Curated annotation (Swiss-Prot):
It comes from the Bacteria. ATP binds at G602, P603, N604, M605, S606, G607, K608, S609. This protein is involved in the repair of mismatches in DNA. It is possible that it carries out the mismatch recognition step. It holds the Pfam family MutS_V. One of its GO terms (biological process) is mismatch repair. InterPro entries: DNA_mismatch_repair_MutS, DNA_mismatch_repair_MutS-lik_N, DNA_mismatch_repair_MutS/MSH, DNA_mismatch_repair_MutS_C, DNA_mismatch_repair_MutS_clamp, DNA_mismatch_repair_MutS_core, DNA_mismatch_repair_MutS_N, DNA_mismatch_repair_MutS_sf. The keyword Nucleotide-binding applies. The keyword Lyase does not apply. Belongs to the DNA mismatch repair MutS family. It comes from Streptococcus pneumoniae serotype 4 (strain ATCC BAA-334 / TIGR4). This is DNA mismatch repair protein HexA. NCBIfam families: mutS1 (TIGR01070), PRK05399.1 (NF003810). PROSITE patterns: DNA_MISMATCH_REPAIR_2. GO terms for molecular function: ATP binding; ATP-dependent DNA damage sensor activity; damaged DNA binding; mismatched DNA binding.
Length: 844
């Protein structure tokens, strides 16, 4: 970037840009934000705006692009959405009063994790994550700058850190330590995160907890430092940090949540077709955010679950009151977002009017709950603080039709401030006086077309055409000459104009000052507003669960202290809703206390996966406080759910289906307890038949002997059904089929015992494979069944015979075996093991 012979303004730009090399610098110049040099070239392409140049006639013209300040937010949103940072440099003084170059400073750096304003605000959280490390310990802190929520936890390995970041759907991570090359590869390339570094700490005794572990303390304080460094203002809406443990909630990793379609459909990436879509009858943005949080983190505390259930039951029992409650919630705006705008100093009159409207709805909501006369609701009612003094202040001060821009005037109600009313009176009377002067001078001069006009240059003036110049009174003085007319003034008109201009300026200044005082006063209520937002959100979520329970015919589940599962005529609620008018076939799931594993067999497409997901979905719904789809349901409280359902290859990181299967299986058997739920669907299909079967059997045996977790294990290895005779806690179940006159019907019904056929050719027929291909497959199948062999017969005689080593013969020792024998696998990370395997595979 050349800096020779730059103008003072461009030198100022260059100096500021040096401080923010990783951000687009939006440099305020009048009514535009300008970008220069590489920023201009890149922004023009990304934002699809014109690229021009400054000093076009110079040897090296400076590339330039700009966006209007009043519509800048939509352009900022595009840059942030694509993972860039944006630094905003504002004019810090009035250009008209500046001596030399206008003073400019960066007032905010907007990053993917610190977005507060947006041209498209939504109800999703935007979490900014910070991680720090001390030895093998990790501290992970995160916050949402809109809601002010602030959390921290401690984790024991980098895999758990990545899992938590995925669960939070964070886009930016603040790093308090230097990443290894491997860690950077995972975070930046595989997880596509924006990485920011922060070495300094921000010590805030109000927000931080001195009882935190050191690494948790540093992760929290560095996150605070980064937020203050980028936002450059007081953040009074941030809540004190809350420490949590992942084990305090029903644990599910990112893959499990994705396979169960908890908050979005895994195939479409959209809300529709997810549990969130099913349960969301919320009426407020806060309620929607809280519901999503409850789905992500179901409870393991029976007392808290039952507390939620009881409120849902109250709402079910009071239909008309619930209907009134729903209507009242529709008048509630996003209090958390409004509170953050107050804290950021960005509140406009519209925000305050929305806040007043919300506060005026609270007494009605509270009265509805009190009218139900249920002790269960007492804790909710206590959170509904209407803050009447704040609602009264805003309603008395802000005009109902106030403009959004605080400098446009007309913000403050008439009658709120006596001095402001006087200025407005002068303006109104001045307008009347001008009309009177116009009429008087028209009559006295005899100029019938005489009129008073106004523009910024000449102020108020009499407009006289050339044909009437001979009738101009002597006390008129010329202000401007035009081609066909002239403009005149009088001392009287000038005096009134002066009074009006003075009143207009004083009125505007006073109105702005009053609004600033009101905004400052509102800022004193931020904590109470946040508490109110939490209360309304909780009410909203619980009424939503009641509505869904009623419309989807859900029942209240019971929790036992044993490990028994007894779900009578259970349904997969999301699948049922998607099916619409079609008939959903319910299934009973029963696992006695001494049964830990159900081995599920049956044809593809028969409903094995849905049956397994049904159990997991029911458990999640039950533990977040929702009612569940069944005739009756008795469940244990699970501490974790592990799944391997689906076969999506992880192509980005180069991991095959089988590798993903093995990693997820390892995650389950490493972390599951006897109180966990494990779902494995067709484990082992990503490798050779014998390998897959051997692994599947050994995993089943390991879970049976060492873990004891409730497990549904669906398999196409029918040989595994014989395990029922040797594993006392395993039972076989299968998906029933009806075979009649050569036609096969899948009944989607789970019955005891193993399946006798796989019906793979029938599934292929449904998929539309050619008839001659299916006939050939049927012939091969008959030959295999007659021969009792696992290997298919050759299509034709080959000219050479390839000898295959027996699976059980001892082969010559391969050099790779020697290398494997040297590995100290107990002191290696999973990633190191995988890297070694990749290297060895390349040698084969």
């Amino acid at each position: 970037m050349a800096i020779e012979k730059l103008s003072p303004g461009m030198q100022q730009y260059v100096d500021i840009k040096k401080q923010y090399p990783d951000a687009f610098l939006l440099f305020r110049m009048g009514d535009f934000y300008e970008l220069f040099y590489e920023d201009a070239v890149n922004a023009a392409q990304i934002l699809e705006i014109s690229l021009t140049s400054r000093n076009k006639n110079a040897d090296n013209p400076i590339p330039m692009a700009g966006v209007p300040y009043h519509s800048a937010q939509q352009y900022i949103d595009v840059l942030i959405e694509q993972g860039y940072k944006v630094a905003i440099a504002e004019q810090m003084e009035d250009p008209k009063q500046a001596v030399g170059v206008v003073k400019r400073e960066v007032v905010q750096v907007i990053t993917p994790g610190t977005v507060v304003d947006s041209s498209k605000p939504d109800s999703q959280n935007n979490f900014l994550v910070s991680i720090d490390r001390e030895g093998n310990q990790f501290g992970l802190a995160y916050m949402d700058l809109v809601t002010g929520d602030f959390y921290v936890t401690g984790l024991l390995d980098f895999t758990l850190v990545c899992g938590e970041i995925r669960n939070l759907k964070a886009r930016e991570v603040v790093l308090g330590y230097d990443l290894s090359e491997e860690e950077e590869q995972i975070l930046s390339r595989q997880m596509n995160l924006v990485l920011s570094y922060e070495k300094e700490s921000f010590e805030d005794l109000h927000l931080l907890d001195l009882r935190l572990a050191t690494v948790e303390q540093t992760a929290s304080s560095k996150l605070l430092q980064y937020v203050h460094r980028t936002q450059m203002r007081e953040l009074n809406h941030l809540k004190p940090v809350i420490r949590y443990e992942i084990k305090d909630f029903l644990q599910m990793d990112y893959a499990t949540k994705a396979s169960l379609d908890l908050v979005e459909n895994a195939r479409s990436g959209k809300k529709q077709g997810s549990l969130f879509w099913l349960l969301d009858e919320t009426k407020t943005a806060m309620g929607m955010r809280l519901l999503r949080s409850w789905i992500h983190r179901p409870l393991i505390d029976k007392e808290r679950i039952v507390q939620r259930q009881e409120v849902v039951q109250v709402f079910l029992d009071h239909f008309f009151e619930r209907s009134d409650l729903t209507d009242s919630l529709k008048g509630v705006y996003d209090i958390e977002r409004l509170a953050s705008r107050v804290s950021f100093g960005k509140t406009n009159p519209k925000d305050l009017l929305q806040l007043a409207t919300t506060l005026s709805s609270v007494p009605r909501i509270r009265a509805i709950l009190e009218g139900m006369e249920q002790p269960t609701l007492a804790y909710l009612i206590a959170q509904l603080d209407a803050i009447p003094e704040l609602e009264s202040l805003i309603s008395a001060a802000i005009a109902p039709e106030a403009p959004h821009v605080i400098t446009d005037g007309g913000i403050i109600r008439t009658g709120f401030d006596e001095t402001l009313d006087k200025y407005r009176c002068v303006l109104r009377e001045g307008t009347s006086w001008i009309a009177e002067i116009e009429a008087k001078e028209r009559e006295n001069s005899g100029i019938s077309t005489l009129k008073i006009d106004y523009n910024k240059k000449d102020g108020y003036y009499f407009h006289v055409t050339n044909s009437q110049l001979g009738n101009v009174p002597a006390h008129f003085f010329r202000k401007a000459t035009l081609k066909n007319s002239e403009r005149f003034g009088t001392e009287e008109l000038a005096r009134i104009e002066g009074d009006m201009l003075e009143a207009r300026e004083k009125s505007a200044n006073l109105e702005y000052e009053i609004f600033m005082r009101i905004r400052e006063e509102v800022g004193k209520y931020i904590q109470r507003l946040q508490a109110l937002a939490q209360g309304i959100a909780t009410v909203d979520v619980l009424q939503s669960l009641a509505v869904v329970a009623e419309t989807q015919h859900l029942i209240r589940p019971e929790f036992g202290d044993d490990s028994q599962i007894d779900i009578r005529k259970g349904r997969h609620a999301v699948v049922e809703k998607v099916m619409g008018a079609q008939t959903y076939i319910p299934n009973t799931i029963q696992m006695a206390e001494d049964t830990s594993i159900q081995l599920v067999t049956g044809p593809n497409m028969s409903g094995k996966s849905t049956y397994m997901r049904q159990l997991a979905m029911t458990a999640v719904m039950a533990q977040l406080g929702s009612y569940v789809p069944a005739e009756s349901a008795h469940l244990p409280i699970f501490d974790a759910i592990f799944t391997r359902i689906g076969a999506a290859d992880d192509l980005v990181s180069g991991q095959s289906t089988f590798m993903v299967e093995m990693m997820e299986a390892n995650n389950a058997i490493s972390h599951a307890t006897k109180n966990s739920l494990i779902l494995f669907d067709e484990l082992g299909r990503g490798t050779a038949t014998y390998d897959g079967m051997a692994l599947a059997q050994s995993i089943i045996e390991y879970i049976h002997e060492h873990i004891g977790a409730k497990t549904l294990f669906a398999t196409h290895y029918h040989e595994l059904t014989s395990l029922e005779s040797s594993l006392q806690h395993l039972v076989n179940v299968h998906v029933a089929t009806l075979e009649q006159d050569g036609q096969v019907t899948f009944l989607h019904k789970i019955e005891p015992g193993p399946a006798d056929k796989s019906y793979g050719i029938h599934v292929a027929k449904i998929a539309g494979l050619p008839a001659d291909l299916l006939a050939r497959a049927d012939k091969i199948l008959t030959q295999l069944e007659n021969q009792g062999t696992e290997s298919p017969p050759p299509m034709r005689q080959t000219s050479a015979v390839t000898e295959q080593i027996s699976l059980f013969d001892r082969a010559e020792e391969h050099p790779i075996l020697a290398e494997l024998a040297k590995l100290d696998v107990y002191n290696m990370t999973p990633m190191q093991v995988m890297n070694v395997l990749v290297e060895l595979k390349q040698k084969l």
